[in-house]
């Protein structure tokens, strides 16, 4: 049973451990089933003839969390055209890094995936510090392929500027198909 409705576990009293490394509240099995479901949708698109480098997955809030996992630890890690994460968080704590290492040992990853990470500086559901924490991790893993936007005054929502920035990123990431 979760301790709170927040996707980010929060300590109850000072002196308790930092929730950054507390992944026991995350439903790893459920999340990985969601990742596999998204991979099944990608499979169908690839079977229909869509080039993998033209497929972008993305989500807002919990959808962001699952999209980040698809981009980092699924069988499509490094192969997608892009991953979009809006106002979300990176679940499973330190397990993600371990899962990535296991995947790299099994497969040669020629990582081409581009990333768009955006967040509201006034988000009270997923605090800015949590965004900065996972942004640093993803930039460390994915390097210069990560574009980051922080919107002052925006809470756990989207604003026109974010949508415009995402649109511009998609235009750069997915150039027109040459007929």
Describe the function of each predicted region:
Residues 1-52:
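Serine-hydrolase catalytic machinery in alpha/beta-hydrolase-like enzymes
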Residues 25-32, 61, 125, 157-160:
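Intrinsic disorder
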Residues 33, 37, 65-66, 130-133, ...:
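Acidic, Ser/Thr-rich intrinsically disordered and amphipathic helical segments
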Residues 40-45, 73, 137-138, 169:
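A generic secondary-structure signal
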Residues 46-50, 72-76, 108-109, 171, ...:
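Residue-level signal for alpha-helix termini/capping positions
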Residues 48-102:
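Primarily recognizes the serine-hydrolase "nucleophile elbow" in alpha/beta-hydrolase
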Residues 85-178:
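The feature captures the conserved acid-bearing segment of alpha/beta-hydrolase catalytic domains
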